[in-house]
Amino acid sequence: MDNLQSIKAQFIAQINAYQPEKDRDIVVFQCNTETTFSLLAWLKAQQYYPQFYLHGRDGATKWASIGQVRQFSDVSAAAHFIQEQQLALLGGLQFYGDALFVLPRLLLQQRQDGMTITLFIDGKQFEQDKLVALACLSTFEKQTALQTVKQEISLISQKADQAEWCRWVEQGLQKIKQGELSKIVLANERCFKTAAPLAATDLLAESEKYNLGCYHFMLAESEQRAFIGSSPELLYRRHGLQLKTEALAGTAFMGEDEQQNQQQSDWLLHDKKNEYENQLVVDGICQNLQPFVQQITIEKVELKKLRKVQHLRRRISAQLKAGCGDKDILLAMHPTAAVAGLPQLEAKQALRKLENFDRTWYAGTLGVMGPAYADFCVTIRSAFIEQAENDSQLCVFAGAGIVEGSIPLLEWREIERKAMGLVSLLQQNQL
């Protein structure tokens, strides 16, 4: 594209004209343009990693990045860097707390009225690092067309079949009966082999079309492996000291029949078990936030309707105390009772014993963290895509909240339904 070629030339000229300054930690070059284009098609053409993509749930903002100038595996160090440099980082926490935050090489932030493109170079070793930056710009103007994802897929493995997963549920219910837990969220992983190579960018673009009202995210740490998903769930959003979060828990089906969907909605809004499950998440969030906020407002229950399922949701807003920031909120809130259980620590310990796999990024959190603004989603409805020579492997995750009164077989059907949000995109006549 001519405009991207022009922006690339501007960046190269700015880099070559820059005179390094002593004690300048990060050098920032920035360009604004009214041009908009598919960030996923752009990412597909880029060769530098890690790659990050986040499409905000409100639909107004998208972020895409390639490469990295700084990387942090500690939330405190990441938060300190943000305050010191007044720059935003991308990344998040895996389910069990391992952190990854990066200052990318190139960051594209797309809004409805245009785009801001930012290039970062390490000021402490500018001459060496500018060569990496220039190499990263070599394909800046390129895009690769997104392809259809419809193809044959076959199930090759699952961490638990129906019988074993239902046994996990029975064990979880036993812990609830004994008073060790009030809720536990059990998940499963199912792996499919595709008939032809499947690009993560292609599948995520397809998901954006059909899985509306969601965050859409991708974290590709290499060309061979990417984590993607379309999550309905906000962990939290912060503007200054204003915090917004939500309790998303309690599930019913959604399908093609509007009358049946309405019946499911009415049932969900009046079902005591689902109401209780959602209230546990509200209680868990409020309890974890309490040391860091001045006041909490909880709104009335509403429905969050998706393509395959619908959920109970209660929006929660709070005013942060002065001096409290993202480090405090992230570590206090994650993982919420919506994806782990309650009490938080005991639920995580139980999951390590019951589930026979490491969740890594599933039910973690990914987002943007800056000085005045943060936006994090919960990485559910997600999958890993691994590339082989002639095909790909798609490993899909789904979970269900188990509380007193949960019926194992119904919970199994729920996770099957949730997994279809991504799997059905590949299958003919399954949308």
Curated annotation (Swiss-Prot):
Residues annotated to bind Mg(2+): E277, E414
Active site per UniProt: K183 (proton acceptor), E233 (proton donor)
Pfam families given in the database record: Chorismate_bind
Keyword Isomerase: yes
InterPro entries: ADC_synthase, Chorismate_C, IsoChor_synthase, MenF, MenF-like
SUPFAM superfamilies membership: ADC synthase
Chemical reaction(s) catalysed: chorismate = isochorismate
MF annotations from Gene Ontology: isochorismate synthase activity; magnesium ion binding
Pathway: Quinol/quinone metabolism; 1,4-dihydroxy-2-naphthoate biosynthesis; 1,4-dihydroxy-2-naphthoate from chorismate: step 1/7; Quinol/quinone metabolism; menaquinone biosynthesis
Keywords carried by this UniProt record: Isomerase, Magnesium, Menaquinone biosynthesis, Metal-binding
Keyword Ribosomal protein recorded: no
EC number of the protein: 5.4.4.2
Role description: Catalyzes the conversion of chorismate to isochorismate.
Family: Belongs to the isochorismate synthase family.
PANTHER family: ISOCHORISMATE SYNTHASE 2, CHLOROPLASTIC, PTHR47253
Xref: HAMAP family: MenF
Name the record gives this protein: Isochorismate synthase MenF
Phylogenetic lineage: Bacteria, Pseudomonadati, Pseudomonadota, Gammaproteobacteria, Pasteurellales
Gene from which this protein is expressed: menF
